[in-house]
């Protein structure tokens, strides 16, 4: 899907942490001791990071800032992930956001005020909404436009803008 959308804007709302920025420790934690799942997640991370580094890439990512706060605290799904691993993950996110900017732009909104389902919008060609175990693929031009407009509204209402994102992630304290 990324290849088909080369040269077009990709809009991205991650389900958890941004896939392309996961560290090996976070991948291992998410894989829950399954070597096969760990390898699959690592390949996915590597592929998405490679695509993001290509010069024709234009990716906007928007997510609730609370997702990163919960991660830093080691709460919710992240209970049990060592504080050191979480610190390293946050540092990796900040560094990667800086490295890829401006072709990759991360925006953070207040999840108490707005909601966005996990999804990727590939230009105006297609959209994939993550439903937990699978993706709902959308090809309707009008639905894709509606999703893109909703995504753009999240950017307009962002509390943390792309040029501030790396510094905002760095200020998070792990507990």
Task: Show the residue positions of the predicted features.
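Hydrophobic protein-protein interaction segments
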Residues: 2-174
């Amino acid at each position: 899907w990324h290849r088909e959308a080369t040269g077009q804007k990709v809009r991205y709302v991650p389900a958890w942490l941004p896939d392309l920025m996961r560290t090996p420790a976070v991948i291992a934690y998410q894989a829950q001791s399954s070597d096969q799942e760990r390898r699959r997640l690592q390949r996915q991370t590597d592929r998405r990071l490679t695509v993001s580094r290509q010069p024709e890439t234009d990716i906007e990512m928007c997510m609730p800032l609370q997702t990163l706060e919960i991660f830093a605290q080691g709460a919710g799904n992240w209970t049990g992930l060592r504080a050191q691993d979480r610190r390293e993950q946050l540092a990796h996110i900040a560094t990667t956001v800086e490295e890829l900017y401006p072709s990759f732009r991360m925006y953070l909104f207040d999840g108490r005020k707005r909601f966005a389902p996990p999804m990727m919008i590939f230009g105006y060609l297609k959209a994939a909404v993550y439903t937990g175990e699978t993706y709902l693929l959308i090809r309707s031009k009008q639905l894709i436009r509606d999703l893109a407009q909703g995504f753009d509204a999240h950017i307009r209402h962002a509390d943390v803008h792309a040029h501030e994102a790396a510094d905002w992630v760095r200020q998070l304290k792990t507990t």
